Amino acid sequence: MSQPLLQSHLTSLPLIHRGKVRDLYAVGDDHLLIVTTDRVSAFDVILPTPIPGKGEVLTKISEFWFRKLEHIVPNQLADMSLAEAVPDAAERAPLEGRSLVVKRLKALPIEAVVRGYLIGSGWKDYQKTGQVCGNPLPAGLQLADRLPEPIYTPSTKAAVGDHDENVDFDYTAELVGPELAAQVRQTALALYKAAAEYALARGIIIADTKFEFGLDDEGVLHLIDEALTPDSSRFWPADTYRPGISPPSFDKQFVRDYLETLDWNKQAPGPELPPDVVQKTTEKYREALLRLTGAS
């Protein structure tokens, strides 16, 4: 495993943006370099402690899904290698295994969330209204129940430090037009269903996930950002799944659970994480990679 990377520092390429986890660089006019760091965020706050190897795991899982699902929708992956984008070997070394060179696409201002199970904010919404983000559901469902059919519950993309806001389909139609909004919904549901079926055969339930999409110059929809990672999805072990209880996750649940024990107001700056929480979180990310792809 390489050294933990909290922040990338490239001098050969212009930095466009630092997100919660990813650093984005321009590679000419037509490509981007996505560097997935070991930063971890919780409650929309970036924490000061890295999770070693997390960036490499997220990159491998995303690349796996991009290729696995490209029959459903084109994706951002480009033919350019990392060596072509960053020719200097010393500058390139910290980026190996955690970087993707991608096409530069016009990102849509929508988080395309698909939920297959009743958990998190969806469960809270259901308890109050009998619906999830305006989608009516049968009465009598329990926490973590599988939904009769996956539902599409889009949200707006928030700036770093802000919270994404759930919106209805009509709002997304106003943002991008009804035809494109419908295509995003249909594509997100198709991606989720295909991925959930594959993952379940490997012992992982994908309870929900978040996709992002972009358009090329011809207006063709592409899957961008990350795909079905433990950061953008809830992964549960299928062998211990029981409706009525909140299942453990293959993600930063250890981080969230630890932070809930602290007297912290969930605003920046975030607290340091203890070594045992870091270790358990690292192991969970690696287990997700192994189960899904067979790689370690």
From Swiss-Prot:
Gene3D superfamilies cross-referenced by the UniProt entry: ATP-grasp fold, B domain (3.30.470.20), Phosphorylase Kinase, domain 1 (3.30.200.20)
Pathway assigned to this chain's UniProt record: Purine metabolism; IMP biosynthesis via de novo pathway; 5-amino-1-(5-phospho-D-ribosyl)imidazole-4-carboxamide from 5-amino-1-(5-phospho-D-ribosyl)imidazole-4-carboxylate: step 1/2
GO biological process: 'de novo' IMP biosynthetic process
Classification via CDD domains: SAICAR_synt_Sc
ATP-binding listed as a keyword: yes
Record's catalysed reaction(s): 5-amino-1-(5-phospho-D-ribosyl)imidazole-4-carboxylate + L-aspartate + ATP = (2S)-2-[5-amino-1-(5-phospho-beta-D-ribosyl)imidazole-4-carboxamido]succinate + ADP + phosphate + 2 H(+)
Full protein name: Phosphoribosylaminoimidazole-succinocarboxamide synthase
Organism: Thioalkalivibrio sulfidiphilus (strain HL-EbGR7)
